Amino acid sequence: MRAFATNVCTGPVDVLINNAGVSGLWCALGDVDYADMARTFTINALGPLRVTSAMLPGLRQGALRRVAHVTSRMGSLAANTDGGAYAYRMSKAALNMAVRSMSTDLRPEGFVTVLLHPGWVQTDMGGPDATLPAPDSVRGMLRVIDGLNPEHSGRFFDYQGTEVPW
């Protein structure tokens, strides 16, 4: 990642969207696959932190200084009424906490750092019952990003701009 940031992204970066993620195995309590959980955590929680850290020089040169992290409502403590999905939920909750800390650390430099829930999107990960076409989710998240201001930093929104409880 540092090589990419150093050799490819050599100029200003106005907006960074961290959107990589995996669902991990959905195991019942007592059947958790800890190797899969570690992999899921590495991708979903540590990956965005690594990318953002590597991109900071370019972001600091940018005019907008916006960083959006695609997370999930499933990483919300307040919204967890179903249980299960330990790897995914824990990794997204960890990402959410990292972004909250990041927003505090970067706010003095004029950064706006947010979390975005894309909705239940029609992708391989969303599965056959997902209700939201990917282009609609993307359009919505881009509208949210475009409307960000400093008061939004550290907050969690869905693709329609509605704040998600933590």
Curated annotation (Swiss-Prot):
Gene3D superfamilies: NAD(P)-binding Rossmann-like Domain
Effect of a null allele: Mutants fail to form proper multicellular aggregates, to differentiate from rod-shaped cells to environmentally resistant spores and to express development-specific genes.
Keyword Membrane part of the UniProt annotation: yes
Post-translational modification: The mature C-signal (p17) is derived from the precursor sequence (p25) by proteolytic cleavage. The subtilisin-like protease PopC is directly responsible for cleavage of p25 to p17. The cleavage site is probably located between amino acid residues 60 and 68 in p25.
Gene Ontology biological process terms in this record: sporulation resulting in formation of a cellular spore
Entries under Pfam families matching the protein: adh_short
Keyword field: Cell outer membrane, Fruiting body, Membrane, Secreted, Sporulation, Stress response
Activity regulation info: Synthesized as a precursor protein (p25), which is cleaved after secretion to generate the mature active C-signal (p17). The p25 precursor purified from M.xanthus cells does not display C-signal activity.
Ubl conjugation among keywords: no
Major localization class: secreted
Induction entry: Expression increases throughout development, reaching its peak during sporulation. Transcription is inhibited by excess nutrients and stimulated by peptidoglycan components and the B signal. The csgA upstream region appears to process information concerning the levels of nutrients, peptidoglycan components and the B signal. In the absence of nutrients, a region extending 400 bp upstream from the start site is necessary for development and maximal expression. In the presence of low levels of nutrients, a region extending approximately 930 bp upstream is essential for the same tasks.
Function: Cell-cell signaling protein required for fruiting body formation, a multicellular developmental program that is induced in response to starvation. Necessary for rippling, cellular aggregation, spore differentiation and for gene expression that is initiated after 6 hours of starvation. In starving cells, the C-signal directly induces aggregation and sporulation, which are induced at distinct threshold levels of C-signaling. Contact with C-signaling induces cells to glide with high speed and low stop and reversal frequencies toward aggregation centers.
Miscellaneous information on this protein: Overproduction of the CsgA protein has dramatic effects on the developmental program: the rippling stage is bypassed, aggregation occurs prematurely and results in the formation of many small fruiting bodies, sporulation occurs prematurely, C-signal-dependent gene expression is induced prematurely, and aggregation and sporulation are uncoupled. Reduced synthesis of the CsgA protein causes delayed aggregation, reduced sporulation and the formation of large fruiting bodies.
Protein name: C-signal
Native organism: Myxococcus xanthus
Taxonomic lineage from the root: Bacteria, Pseudomonadati, Myxococcota, Myxococcia, Myxococcales
